[in-house]
């Protein structure tokens, strides 16, 4: 029925359907782009294991960081090569849980300490050196009041977990405190940190020995089954 009201209604209905389909396609495409962008951002962030040593005087301690998103598992490695102390850190919720593998206990670690306020002079030298498979830049942080100079050799590889980790742990040692004084340090990790007095005497050294990228199991960052909570009396 050409020119009839039925034909007009049919044409209008088809136009509405076409417009709705186009809008739906645009909405789906926009959602797809956002999802891809989010996945790409997450894919770029470092996930894997970082092994390093801490030297203080004659004492050398081995550690491992297991990193996955907002979660970091810190293991202190014994001379036998197994984990003798473990901390589970959630940098989003700002919580720290300590695990005792020997005693099958876990404990919430409160952090009531105020951040340490120090006056420092920071110099990003631009000097480069290869370390642990990375090209690292030399940063020097100095404080006359604290009688300390710390030289960091930092690598940039989307180590986005590190600054939130330091803020969550809120440690008072100079290696951590001084690093937080550096502006625009997001995404880097110190492959070597040497703490010295102003007269040159070495106080401590943190040195990365191995970096392995790879997907980490979510269970690494959970309290294991069978662990009991340690209650303070």
Named regions from a protein language model:
Residues 4-7, 18-29:
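Bacterial N-terminal signal peptides that target proteins for export
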Residues 9, 13-14:
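Short hydrophobic targeting helices and cationic amphipathic motifs
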Residues 30-38:
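Bacterial N-terminal signal peptides
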Residues 39-43:
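Sec/Tat signal peptide C-region and signal peptidase I cleavage site
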Residues 44-233:
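Extended soluble regions of mature proteins
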